[in-house]
Amino acid sequence: MEVLRAVSQTEVIRDVLLGLRSGQWQFDPDPRNQLGLYAQVFRLDFDDQPLRDARRTVLGLTWAHALAGPGNTVFIANPYGGQESPRQSLPVLDFRLAGLRLGLQRDLGAGWRGNLGVQWEERRHRGPDPLFGRIRHDRQLDLRLGAEYPIGPRLLINPQLLHTRNHATLAPNDFRRTQLLVDVQYRW
């Protein structure tokens, strides 16, 4: 068993800038399985809308399982829950959340590693929206297809296709969105 903490200077700087505090516990019961618990606390600040300033707290479990066979395939599951509470007393912006992430990663060949992910999250607000007179309830589904490829010793490129469907009780929050994202990561 091992307690992991953010100790690198870059992670500490990032956490201070983002207002994030986190902790993680990780346990490897055998060479093919990894279990974990984590806690995250975010301080959300909105420059133009200070009424939305909030604290978001999330607790979760993680399980990663390396499948036998070719491709170095790894299955990942992550149930989580939490709440977001505004600093002002506004029940319309106060909500509880619960979700589940499932993922699969696999070597694709020629240096590429693919990933497939599904995420479901439910958010239940505590007070009625003043404009609509109803309590907001969201059920969001994200589907992600991506890959990563090393373009240097510590540099990776990550193209991803993400589709989001948010079912909401309030029409302005009910939407579909598809995004093509490409990011470049430097691993310290």
List the predicted regions and their residue ranges:
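Gram-negative and organellar
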Residues: 1-188
